């Protein structure tokens, strides 16, 4: 599943328009994260990597978890205990318009907890962002390609 600007993602009764897609190049791998918006609701969607995948990670930016960087080795958040999955300095490219995420370097820390729950902490030159999300089956989303 490749997401592009202006695609529409239907999820949980809302239609989100993809404003842009960030591609993180980290540890020899590329990982995409699409910013999708429905009025004031914002999702960050990590599409499946390959045809054999059947899960998509859906993130939301959170304000109730304040962490320094680098973050600790274990994070307790919303009754989950998160452990590191990967981290490093990523080179980020932007396709579309994402005002507060410029192309360039960003430090990234990804954590995982039981129940396919995830945290992603990003340290940009101008701010630190925390995303919390969960892995959902691909059939929970409907993707309508941009015209």
Which stretches of residues belong to each language-model region?
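Mixed-charge, low-complexity intrinsically disordered regions
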Residues: 1-147
């Amino acid at each position: 599943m490749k997401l592009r600007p202006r695609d529409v993602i239907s999820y949980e009764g809302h239609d989100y328009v993809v404003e842009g897609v960030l591609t993180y190049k980290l540890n020899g791998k590329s990982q995409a994260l699409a910013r999708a918006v429905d009025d004031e609701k914002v999702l960050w969607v990590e599409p499946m990597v390959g045809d054999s995948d059947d899960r998509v990670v859906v993130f939301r930016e959170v304000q109730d978890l304040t962490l320094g960087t680098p973050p600790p080795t274990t994070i307790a958040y919303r009754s989950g205990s998160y452990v590191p999955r990967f981290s490093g300095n990523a080179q980020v490219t932007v396709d579309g318009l994402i005002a507060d995420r410029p192309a360039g370097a960003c430090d990234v820390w990804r954590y995982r907890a039981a129940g396919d729950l995830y945290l992603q902490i990003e340290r940009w030159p101008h701010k630190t962002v925390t995303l919390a999300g969960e892995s959902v089956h691909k059939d929970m989303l409907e993707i309508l390609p941009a015209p």
